[in-house]
Structure formats: C-alpha cells, structure tokens
Amino acid sequence: MKSAHRFPGIALATAVASLGGGIAAADESIYFSELPVVASVSRLPQRLADAPTAVTVIDRDMIKASGVRDLNDVFRLVPGFQTYPHTTEPARVSYHGLNDEDYSPRVQVLIDGRSMYSPLFGNGVNWATIPVALDDIERIEVVRGTNSVSYGSNAFLGVINIITVDPALTRGLSVSVSHGSQNVRDQALRLGGQIGEVGDFRLTYRQLNDDALADRGDWIDNFRSRLVDFRADMALDERNSLQINAGQAEGVTGVGRLNGGRLFGQPTNPIRSLRQTNTYAQLTWRHASSPNSDHQLRYAYVADRSDDAFNIVVPLVPAQVFHINQSGDEGIRHELEFLSNQSLGAVGRIAWGASWRNDTMRSAWVLPGQGTVQRETGRIFGNWEGKPASWLTTNLGLAGENDSLAGFSWSPRLSANFHANAENTIRVGYSRAQRTGSIHDYRADYWSSLTKYQFRADPNMPTERLDTWELGYLGDWRDWRASLDVRLFDEKIHDRLYIIDRDASNIPGNSIPSLTMPIQDVRIRGIEYQLKWQPFEPTRLVLGQTFTDIDSDYLASALSYPKGTLSRPSDYSNIEQLTERSTPRRATSLLWMQALPYKLQFSLAGYWQDKMKWSKNTWSEKYRRFDVRLAYPFRWATWGGEVAYTVQSLNGGHNEYKWSGDPNDRVVDRRQWLTLRLDY
C-alpha cells in the first residue's frame, strides 16, 4: 500500500537558512573542537568527512546531561532511532522501524568490540542485561545506515558501538547513590588502580531498582538489575598490549497477569519474576607492527540465561502439578576475530579480517527433544579507503558470510565523499546487506497447548535483503562553532520476515503451525539531520530531526493461505500498519547543556514524536517529553563529587509503548531522583 504522506522537503532548507542568517558568528578566539575521528564504519580510524556513511557520536557530557538511567534512553538523541522504557515488555531500540520482534535484531550493538546479539533472545539485544554502567562509557558511535560489510548480518540497518573509559582515567574510588520517586534506589561503586608497572584496572559494581510504570489493570511492573564489570589494560611491551573484560549483568522483571484483580491471577500466567543474566569474558591482543600498521586478535565468550518458572496445579484426584518454565533457556556464544589495519602508501589504507562464531541454544520449550542446537558462522571482510585527489575520498567494502543455517551471502558497499573545501563535504553511497533469522526461526518446533501446534521452523527460510542509496552532507563550521550532518536515504527491503499463522481458525486440534516467512517488500525513504552548535562558551545545543515515509507491498506467497493470518481483514490491515507506521513520520530531539554561575550545570532534553506502532494491535500516540537535570560539582579536601537532581517526563504522564484507552496501557509518569557521587 502506498502511503499518502510524504516528508516535508523544506526541513533542511529551514535549518540551513536559520544558521546562515539567524546567528552571529562566534568569537574566533574561542576554540571549537574538531569533528571526532571514528572507527565504527570501515574499521579504519577516519574523520567523519571521510566515512562512508553517517555517524552520530554521543560523548560522556551528552550522556550525563540527558539525565538517563537506562542506556537505551540515550538513543532518543540520535536521528532515526526510537525506544521506550523497560515495562512488562522488554525495552527495544530500533532504527527506521520494523520493530515487531521483542528483541530488536536489525541494529548491531557492541561493547568494546563484543556483540550483544544473543542466540537466546531471537538473535537480538536484551537491554535489560546490557553489561555496562553509564559512568564507564567514554563515547558511543552510532552508525546510521547498514554496516553488514564491517560487522555481519546483524548490522542490517545500523551499528551502536559503545566504547568504555580507559582504566588509566578511573584510578581511585567512586561511590554514588540515587534515591527518588517510583522507588528509585540505585547504588554504584567503582574502584580503579594500577597493575604494577604494566597497566591499569577498573572494577565496577552497580545496582538499579525501581517500580517502573504505575501498576494498571491486570499487570504489575518492577525492575531491578545488578552488574559486576571488570576491565584491565596491560602493555606487554612497546608493540603489544592486552585488554581483559569480564563480568556479569542480571535483570529481574515482573511478568504475568492478574485478571483484573490482585487476589486472583491467571493460573497459566501468574505474577512472577523473569530473571535474565549475561555472563561474559573477552581477551583482546593488539600488535603495532609499524606506525601505520596494527593488528588485533579478539576472543569473546558470552552466556545468556533466563528463567521464569512456576507451577500449575490441576484439581484432579490426586492433584497434578505441572512445572512450567517457558523462559528456562540458555544461549552461549564463542567468537574469534582477527583485524588488520594497514597503510598502502599512495594507494590508500585497508582494514581486513576474518571471524568465526559458534552459537548454541538450549530450550525445553521451543526446541523440545533437540538438546543443544548449534550454529556456526564464518566471515571475511575488507574495507579500502583511497584519496585520489584532495577533494575526493572513496571507500570500497566487501564481506562474505557463511552461516551453517542460512547459507552464504555477500555484502558490498561503495561510497564517494566530495570535499568542496575543509568545511563542506557531500557523500554519495550504495550498499547491500542481508539479514538472517534466529535459531528459533530455523529450528524451533513446539505446541503451545494440547490442541494447538504453535510453531514449526522452516530450515530453508530465505534472508531479508536490503539495498540502500544515500546522499549525505557534512558541514564543519568551526568559525561558527557548529556542525551539521544530513542524511537522505532510500532503503529497499526485500522479503521482510514475519511470523504468520497459516491456520488462524482457532479450531481445537489445529495441527497447522505458524512459521517465520517473507511477507512484504518494504521501502523506507526520508531525511534526517543533526545540528550541534555552541553559540556561547557555556552553552551547547544538539538538535536532531527525522522525517520518514514507509511503503509496503504484500508478497503473493504470504497471501496464499485461505485461513491464514493475512486472510482476516483486521490482521491484514494491522500488520500493514505495523510495517508502515513502525517509525514516527516526524521525530525531533533537542539537548540543551548550560553552565551556570556558582559551578551549577543545567541541562534540558526535549523529545517530540509522532504516532507510531510497536505492536500489531496497539498504537503509541503522539507525545512530547521533557527531562531536566541540575547538578553541582564540588571539591572537599581530598574528595570530589557531584550532587544532581533529575526529573524525567517533567510535563507529566504520556504513553510511549502502547495506547488503547484501557487500564492495560503503559503510561510513563513523572519520575525524579537525587544523586550523590563521591570520588576519592
């Protein structure tokens, strides 16, 4: 169906005109820092002006000023990204929509190079167990656009690369406590020090606790998490270094239903705790063979586990007790990657490498009788950067991936960056990517009850395919202490995957299971930009805006089941809307950071988002949200620290996940807390 809505073409012109005519040039004696160097796109350290696609960099100051407690919230500041808070549903982070899965599988998430994608969570990311504390993040590089060339099929629409702080910068002791409404009770302890003469370490313990959204209707929401994280960096000699990461993150969420009252829960879905853990270890060896050449070998181990066990008592004679644990599963990943960066002299630079990954999953519920299911993936990749002229940078990338469940695929990318001068760059690029399904999609086989055959995987399920054209502009106006990043995109997704019930008649004894299959071709078009401006020394502004239009067409094969999900007009329309309205047609974010007298620091984050859908049968209505933070850093004898007061949703309650006008709606109410941090 072709949407009648089109994004306004005047947005960029308005932004540029306001810069050109509405501001006064800043004092040139005041230094405005250069645009950062990023390595998340091509795996080569590159200026933003040379990178083959758009990148948003979120630094430590932005993270702190945004007033977030949960990491997923910070991506509201990135053009094209959407998220919502932890509720009884898992939090998601998506780019350009298509977010119907519980654990978003189309944006790769990395922490110090380690993928957060899990075979347990549908080959997606579980934000409840993200193993990093906000205070330990140095910066986040967000690649806005497909990057399967560099990171594989999970980087289908983009990459979030989280880089943690060098332990050498965190020596000493740091303690923080937060206390506020909705039972916010957070504690953190960080210890950093030296490892003899060879390196430094950082050890962090963090605990978060809150009652989340106000209890409504038949559900109770609460969330708590614990994290232990260790990092050590050691210089083995002048050319070799070793980085060690290890730890565990745990998230506990309330799930289940009350059937409209707290005394009588649903026997088959009682109120209970869903416990999830992420245990990890990583070794990274780096070798500098010359000033222009280095190599890296990385091994990572990650184990994800979940559990929500309960008993069902059937009143027979004698009574029968059934032990149910739908989430009692385990997913384990071993990954080995080699990466080499080399200078080719006048020919350019190249980053190339190879990786091997072994995923296993065990689940008595969705993989009954199959024991431990294994999946192996091997990749080779390369990215070349050339500068044939001072006004031109070219990037060429190619990757091949062989998946034991999905087969072999290629991912190419080509871009050209035209530098009009040192301040203005135009970028044109094309890329192709493929996204594979999860172990569940290829191997699951289970009944949901004695009368319903719920799901049977298709071992020959095809992959999603993406062709992307983009036109970008990057302005680095140092005299004005401002930068502007613009991306126009045309993304065509072929064979979008979705779970379809081939017999939705709900007749007892139904033996035709659902499966994941291609249902649509999707086209995503739009424009997004981010403006960073420091009009005065104590003032920083970050403005982001996105206009997006999604069209979709059903495939004939998806409509071929006369009793299937898509044979019902309501489901046909709802799934079509779930695709086309899976991202807001217009979304805006603004972050204002202001230094005040007496060392006070003030910040305001504002978000304006149009109506969209996170689930098939509900809507997230249009909303505005404002978060504020006021902080006072201090020094007392040998102690330093900060007192901060934060308010989220200052303008009151609103909906971010779903809204249907009944008590089950998820309403985000005002939340406020006070934080004290002491550093020694």
Question: What residues fall within each predicted segment?
Answer:
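Extracytoplasmic beta-strand/coil segments of soluble accessory domains associated
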Residues: L35, S40, R47, N72, ...
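N-terminal periplasmic accessory domains that precede
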Residues: L71-V74, R92-H96, V107-D112, W127-I130, ...
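Surface-exposed extracellular loop regions of Gram-negative outer-membrane beta-barrel proteins
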Residues: N99, V252, L258-L263, T360, ...
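Short acidic/polar hinge/loop motifs at secondary-structure boundaries
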Residues: S115-R144
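Periplasmic-side early beta-strands and strand-to-turn transitions of outer-membrane beta-barrels
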Residues: S148, N161, A168-T170, S178, ...
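Conserved C-terminal beta-signal and adjacent last beta-strands/turns
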Residues: G192, M234-A235, V428, L541, ...
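Membrane-embedded beta-barrel scaffold of Gram-negative outer-membrane proteins
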Residues: G199, D294-F310, H419, R427, ...
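Gram-negative outer-membrane beta-barrel transporters
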Residues: K387-S390, D490-K492, L515-M612, H654, ...
